[in-house]
Amino acid sequence: MGTPSFLLGSGLICEPRFKWFQAIATHFLKVPVFNDDPVSPPYDADMEDPRIAEHYKAQIRASLNAQIAFLEGQTGKKLDIGRFREIMKNSQEAIRYWYEVLELRKAVPCPMGSEDYFTAIIPFLYLAGEREAVDFYRDLYREVKERVDRGVGVIPEERYRFGWLGIPPWFNLGLFNYLQTLGAMVCIESTYYVGHPVEVDLTDPVEGWVERTWQTGKFKNQQGSEANPDICNPGVFNPGVGGELIKRWVSEYRLDGAIAHRTRSCRATSMGQLHMKNILAELGVPMMIFESDMVDPRAWSDAQIKRQFQDFLEIVETHKKRKS
């Protein structure tokens, strides 16, 4: 890998991230660095108050303009407004299709599993402004819609429907296939959840970005950010969702329970899991929390974790019988 000309960083979610690139740029590579400033309104802020809206939009606007100035200075090129408008247009369309795919997963039987969700996020995270992402999510939407129309699910018989909280063990997405052999489907995930799409006027794409950033953050805040204010940050990466949205998911996705992965190498994505467990308990919905890692297989004990899932399914079955 060659030496970069400059570095772009962010303090979003992961508390040491802000210092990582700063340390690399000042102590190792000696290159310029720009760190974006996260936006995290308090969970109890009145997001309908125009004064609060203008305060945070001014922060977003200043940060974005500073980043543009930094990039123009480093590259010697001016921002191509037309290209930026095209990127914004593509991202709005791609996000809309992706959101509709997740809405289709409310169907019974569920047409798309978590193992596919965690692989289908890649264009959303890295190619959202490209036409390739629009084409990908449009085709995915059509495929999943056809499955729903035909009543085709991932597994022949769904016994349990779950929500997933946290980052998955990337080295073992087959975990979701194992759950499916037990009749359990993960139908919705909190991490990387795209949220309701926001359409904005792109006459001035920079200001459109500011508005979309604010509206996205506002939506996330109003869905509950009491456990982790960073979830209302506008970045497409999301560590989780709020309590109000979780409550809605229980009914909309007909969830019988939830599974949370407490991952050792990304603490931020584990924040609020006990809080969410308490919220679900009030609704009579059980939730299990298991611990391992998202990238280190040494933290994985296959027999032990599978036994935890088997025990949890017995609890879920008991809850279902009590409700029937």
Please state what every model-predicted region is:
Residues 1, 62-85, 214-240, 316-324:
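Extended, charge-rich low-complexity interaction segments
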Residues 1-70:
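Gly/lys/ser-thr-rich phosphate-binding loops in alpha/beta enzymes
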Residues 42-47, 195-202, 298-301:
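Short, charged, surface-exposed secondary-structure boundary motifs
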Residues 57-197, 235:
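A charged, amphipathic alpha-helical module
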Residues 166-238, 242-245:
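Redox- and metal-dependent alpha/beta enzyme cores, enriched for Fe-S-associated oxidoreductases
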